[in-house]
């Protein structure tokens, strides 16, 4: 509390204030380099902050695009997930990224990050002496990243994942005779003429959107225990059996 000059007696409130001030100091806040202190706030909260801007000098509310996964865990190992750029990643790519950027962490979103990432625009901002934004306009428009098209058939991918999950559970339950300790597996569907991958499934999978909206400690431990991030279809080593 002394370090950040906090006089608040309520421990819970003091902790929240310290968290915000720590993030500000860690990210090197300045009038021209904002720090995100809250995401996905309600419309009510956003409007209250805007209407009472004089009470929150140096604070502004902005609308930003978000990454969504409309099909949930489908093709999670192929697509991968995105997350906030780490200090190490930022320091290695300061010329390309901002400390508040979201980048690909795994899968296609990591491998093709340089193609998927667009070009930042330039916004000219006028501020008052207390840091409050008084006027702003776009000096240079941002450019969207490239579109990446995969050979994956989404319907076939869904069927493949469902069949893989069912078969693993059936094997574990002894539906085919003897019970086995089956917990994981992989399946790949390839066009034998072109070599294109039409479906690629790995089980267990995960919900990539949780890494954006906020993953709980319980779910994180569950994923780590099951090694859910591991793409068994391309990284696993298995004795050959048969193919169809």
What annotation goes with each model-predicted range?
Residues 140-196, 200, 208-244:
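Active-site loop and adjoining helix of the penicillin-binding protein/serine DD-peptidase-beta-lactamase fold
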Residues 1-142, 165-186, 192:
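Membrane-proximal periplasmic segments of bacterial cell-envelope enzymes
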Residues 205:
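A motif-centric feature for acidic-aromatic and gly/ser/thr-rich catalytic loops and repeats
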Residues 81, 200-202:
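Residue-level detector of high-confidence beta-strand sites
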């Amino acid at each position: 509390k002394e370090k950040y000059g906090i006089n608040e007696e309520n421990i819970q409130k003091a902790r929240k204030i310290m968290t915000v001030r720590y993030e500000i100091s860690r990210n090197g806040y300045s009038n021209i380099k904002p720090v995100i202190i809250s995401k996905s706030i309600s419309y009510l909260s956003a409007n209250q902050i805007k209407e009472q801007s004089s009470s929150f000098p140096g604070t502004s509310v902005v609308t930003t695009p978000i990454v969504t996964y409309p099909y949930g865990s489908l093709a999670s190992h192929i697509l991968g997930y995105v997350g906030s750029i780490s200090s190490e990643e930022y320091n290695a790519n300061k010329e390309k990224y901002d400390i508040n950027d979201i980048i690909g962490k795994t899968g296609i979103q990591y491998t093709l990050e340089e193609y998927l990432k667009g070009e930042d625009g330039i916004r000219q901002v006028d501020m008052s002496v207390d840091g409050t934004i008084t006027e702003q306009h776009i000096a240079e428009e941002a450019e969207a990243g490239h579109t990446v098209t995969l050979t994956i058939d989404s319907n076939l991918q869904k069927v493949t994942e469902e069949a893989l999950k069912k078969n693993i559970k059936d094997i574990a339950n002894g539906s085919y005779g003897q019970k086995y300790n089956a917990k994981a597996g992989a399946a790949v569907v390839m066009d034998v003429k072109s070599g294109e991958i039409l479906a690629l499934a790995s089980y267990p999978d995960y919900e990539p959107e949780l890494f954006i909206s906020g993953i709980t400690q319980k779910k994180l431990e569950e994923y780590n225990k099951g090694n859910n991030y591991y793409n068994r279809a391309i990284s696993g080593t298995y004795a050959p059996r048969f193919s169809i």
